[in-house]
A protein has these predicted regions:
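Ser/Thr-glycine-rich phosphate-binding loops at phosphate-binding pockets of nucleotides
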Residues: 12, 39-47
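Short, acidic, metal-binding catalytic loop of nucleotide-sugar glycosyltransferases
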Residues: 26-35
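Short beta-strand/loop segment that forms part of the nucleotide-sugar
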Residues: 34-42, 63-67
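Short acidic donor-binding/metal-coordinating loop in glycosyltransferase active sites
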Residues: 41, 91, 98-102
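Active-site-proximal specificity loops/subdomain of glycosyltransferases
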Residues: 48-96
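Catalytic-site signature of metal-activated, phosphate-bearing donor transferases
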Residues: 74-76, 105-311
Length: 311
């Protein structure tokens, strides 16, 4: 147990992430995370087999549900994970994210950073990891080699009212910059004893003391591997489309425009075109590097190379 008074526990929800979840777990163990609390909401791709290995080793507590279309707040498994981390593992701090998201702490590991945190609630920016080509054939590199980070992402919003209009879905595909360089919402780390509830998306917590001021990290970040390969991307879009069909924005205010758009692209057989747009050409990479929209940062890749590959 660290000098924090208890372990750092990472809480995450998961569905169908077999290609990345072992790397995710090993990476964060290497950063000083000691325990995990996971909620699987219906994986069918081998993810559960991997999670069960870590459950048997004592590193992970696993809760299983079977319908990924049920809204998280209807079962409140988000907050339940925080309570589990506090009550079962006696967590000092909790990190909250998804298994395609990797924490990067400036200059140190998780316990070292959190020991000096100026607030019991810390908001980390989340940046997309930009896919790169492995060779001249245009094939996508293994995600473990990605070293381009959208550190100054573009801020724009999708007009999802276009979905029902003639040519609207095509416009959603082509009339915007690639989604991979768009701003995405942050993630949160919090001391376990201040958490009253967890906000959907793991973007913040409801603190027991409403006067707590959040510290906003500026050097560290959470790297998001949302587009790793075409099959993974299409399956994620299928799950999103299924969720949006059951939970349209009129019912679920947490259904983001990003998800509504992704569901529409999937339902109109445009998802592989959308994936191709996330792979920037060498000319686009050079231009975005000059603009400062993306930066080279191999910290995640270097740690993953030490792990030696996962699933």
């Amino acid at each position: 147990v660290s000098d924090l008074g208890g372990p750092v526990v990472l809480c995450f929800g998961v569905v169908d992430e077999a290609d990345i979840v072992k790397d995710f777990l090993e990476y964060h163990l290497g950063l000083g995370v000691e325990k995990f609390v996971a909620t699987d909401v219906g994986s069918t791709d081998g993810t559960l087999d991997i999670l069960c290995d870590y459950e048997r080793s004592g590193h992970l507590h696993l809760t299983r549900f079977h319908d990924p279309s049920v809204r998280a707040e209807n079962r409140d498994w988000l907050s339940a994970m925080a309570y589990r981390a506090r009550d079962t593992y006696r967590a000092s701090w909790c990190l909250f994210c998804d298994p395609d998201e990797f924490w990067v702490f400036p200059e140190t590991d998780a316990p070292g950073y959190l020991a000096a945190a100026p607030s019991p609630v810390v908001i980390f920016p989340r940046y997309n990891m930009v896919p790169t080509c492995a060779n001249d054939s245009g094939e996508v590199a293994d995600f473990r080699e990605f070293d381009l980070v959208a550190r100054r992402p573009l801020e724009f919003f999708y007009d999802t009212q276009m979905v029902g209009k003639p040519g609207g879905v095509e416009a959603l595909l082509w009339d915007y910059a690639p989604d991979i360089i768009r701003f995405v919402a942050p993630k949160v780390a919090a001391r376990s004893d201040v958490i009253r509830a967890v906000v959907p998306g793991f973007h913040d917590v409801v603190a027991a003391d409403p006067s707590i001021v959040r510290h906003r990290e500026t050097r560290g970040y959470v790297g998001h591997f949302q587009a790793r390969n075409a099959a993974q991307f299409a399956n994620k879009a299928r799950l999103v489309a299924d969720y949006i069909a059951v939970n349209p924005p009129s019912v679920d205010r947490h259904s983001s425009r990003h998800w509504v758009r992704l569901a529409a692209l999937y339902n109109h057989d445009m998802i592989y075109q959308e994936f191709a747009r996330q792979i920037l050409s060498p000319e686009e990479v050079a231009a975005r590097l000059r603009e400062g929209v993306i930066e080279r940062d191999n910290r995640i890749a270097a740690r993953l190379a030490l792990i030696g590959g996962g699933a």
